[in-house]
Amino acid sequence: MSSKYEGLRSEHLYRDIFDVDAPSDTTLGSQVWPRRPGVFIRNTQAGPSVEGTEPPASARELVVGQFGLVPPWVKSAADAKLRSPKLVNARAETASTSNHYRGAWLGAQRCIVPMMAFHQDDWRSGKAVPTRIARVDGKPMGVAGLWERWSGAQGEEIVSFCLLTVNANSHALMHRYGQPGSEKRMLAILNEGAYGAWLNAPHPEKAREFMRAYPAQGLTANPIEKKRAAD
């Protein structure tokens, strides 16, 4: 499971790579883990079309949300707090049928989660070694995700998101990571040229075409060194 990732390092990357403005929220941290705030990119409509004119083009917006999806059927904020840490990764193969993710998938609530790298454990030594996975060229990744909006009976509102994953059993790099004996998974990293097509896919089955493993030669993995305590 990929439950921790690193946000973008520089504001200009949001505009240059993802065509959105950088977040104005200065409280966002560089590391994101379950129930922490992060950002995602989704489509927003410019407005209703006027008769006789072309329909408005979809524009992108950057949204701050909680990492860990909160399905709309959750009964209370307390229930959401318990469930969301377990709902950070959605299997692409079952997103359309899962009770947790079906509404977002079928409702075209697709998003892109920008990140510099994500963390996974390497268990080949017999113990978990946190490892940083990034692009070889150092550019940001755009990971396919789903978003949701939950409204509580007391007026509470939680905007949340999760990351989609694909099978990595035969992936030249990512098959090394994850618990021994378990299916290997990796995040659904999108090609840069596919960002718009993913967000604008006309129906769920078309969106499924983007659920592919990113090429191993485009990724690099390095163990994360533990910080030494000050003398």
Give short role names for the model-derived ranges.
Residues 1-231:
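Short linear sequence motif anchored by a di-proline
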